[in-house]
Amino acid sequence: MASVVLIGTQWGDEGKGKVTDFLAEKADLVVRYQGGNNAGHTVVAKGEEFKLHLIPSGILYEDKTCVIGNGVVVDPKVLLEELAYLSERKVKTGKLLISSNAHVIMPYHRLLDALEEDSRGEHKIGTTKRGIGPAYMDKTLRIGIRIMDLIDDEEFAAKLRRNLQEKNNLLTKVYGVEPLDYDAIYQEYSGYAQKIRGLVADSSLVIDESLKAGEKVLFEGAQGTLLDLDHGTYPYVTSSHPIAGGACTGAGVGPTRINRVVGVIKAYTTRVGEGPFPTELADETGELMRQNGHEFGTTTGRARRCGWFDAVIARYAVRVSGISDFALMKLDVLSGFEKIKICVGYRVNNEVIYEFPQSQKIFKACEPVYEVIEGWQEDITGVTRFEDLPKAAQDYVRRIEQLTETQVTLIAVGPGREQTIVRGEIF
């Protein structure tokens, strides 16, 4: 038995898709445990680029089984579109299973998400308007429609009718928009149910049987630590738990079954949407990072905000998820910078703090305290051994290890599978 949880350690967009794809080669089962199609991951395989939002990255291996766990909220329309997209690209995909306990994103979730965000005015939280938050709200309120309900005609009809009555009251009386039509939604989603029925399974049981058989299981998180509902930069967070602990509840597996936690971390820092960002660079340096790193959202296309590496955030991620290894991404993007900065602490109210603050009011007031180290000019995209990196690049990696007390086991020097420096085994 071997199981690894793969998480994002910043605000998402760290490059988890590439690492999942890289590690999936040795895994038997790849499990997505939270989030929905608000998260995008890009994978480059055999020179081809694939952009996915809901289906686990491991689907590109035809001998793997991929699982969408109970902690995921599933938009069946998007799911079927992604399967069609892979088919059109003539990809021989692996087996896909969907948890019967996963909740379904309905049309009213998407509509309410957009209406609520627009009503916030200057207090917007940066939602993708894909219905993720409202779907999780219904789950918490215990009125949500699960995959098992969707494929049961009688259950689906009854639950849809009850939900739509409530949601249409909200839409017409609070937001002043037209009500949604029951028959249209029922017909549309019944069609989806027929197409996904054969994929539905007790995912927790599938995972348990795989682990008992001695197989290797990779749990794939979406978003990142600082978007976690409890441990992120609230309220600028997602509605689920991207941290390692989320794998247990979102996949139905006990914590003693987890062997390692790999934190995917970018060699610099990015953020999409609203919220404080101490190391953000609103200058030519930040723009150069954005262009060199192609920092535009997979899901929204929005330009990502860019800044220097923040070791305070990295240490915090290690603490809340028990990270055993880092996968350091996009080291090649920093080639060409004469000097490179690392944030080692925050200055706030004439005091320097070295731990991530719980208060967003304090975090918003934080100014970065930097260490400045030498950069490197060499192109490192073809380097395959750590020892062959420029000395300055090696020193940069070692300094991150020192500041976080965590080993950097994988280093990405380009988007391809083969552009990965391996310094130790994960599985």
UniProtKB/Swiss-Prot annotation:
Keywords on record: Cytoplasm, GTP-binding, Ligase, Magnesium, Metal-binding, Nucleotide-binding, Purine biosynthesis
SMART domains per record: Adenylsucc_synt
Cofactor annotation: Mg(2+)
Subcellular location: Cytoplasm
Residues that, per the record, bind substrate: T298, T299, T300, G301, R302, A303, R304
GO molecular function: adenylosuccinate synthase activity; GTP binding; magnesium ion binding
Keyword Lipid biosynthesis assigned: no
Pathway of action: Purine metabolism; AMP biosynthesis via de novo pathway; AMP from IMP: step 1/2
Predominant subcellular localization, coarse grouping: cytoplasm
One Pfam match: Adenylsucc_synt
GO cellular component: cytoplasm
EC number(s) stated in the UniProt entry for this protein: 6.3.4.4
Catalytic activity: IMP + L-aspartate + GTP = N(6)-(1,2-dicarboxyethyl)-AMP + GDP + phosphate + 2 H(+)
Enzyme class: ligase
Residue numbers binding GTP: 12-18, 40-42, 304, 330-332, 412-414
Biological process annotations from GO: 'de novo' AMP biosynthetic process; IMP metabolic process
List of residues binding IMP: D13, E14, G15, K16, N38, A39, G40, H41, T128, R142, Q223, T238, R302
Gene3D superfamilies: Adenylosuccinate Synthetase, subunit A, domain 1, Adenylosuccinate Synthetase, subunit A, domain 2, Adenylosuccinate Synthetase, subunit A, domain 3
Cofactor note: Binds 1 Mg(2+) ion per subunit.
Domain of life of the organism encoding this protein: Bacteria
Catalytic residues (UniProt): D13 (proton acceptor), H41 (proton donor)
Record NCBIfam families: PRK01117.1, purA
Role according to the record: Plays an important role in the de novo pathway of purine nucleotide biosynthesis. Catalyzes the first committed step in the biosynthesis of AMP from IMP.
Subunit structure, as described in the record: Homodimer.
Protein name as catalogued: Adenylosuccinate synthetase
Organism the protein comes from: Desulfitobacterium hafniense (strain DSM 10664 / DCB-2)
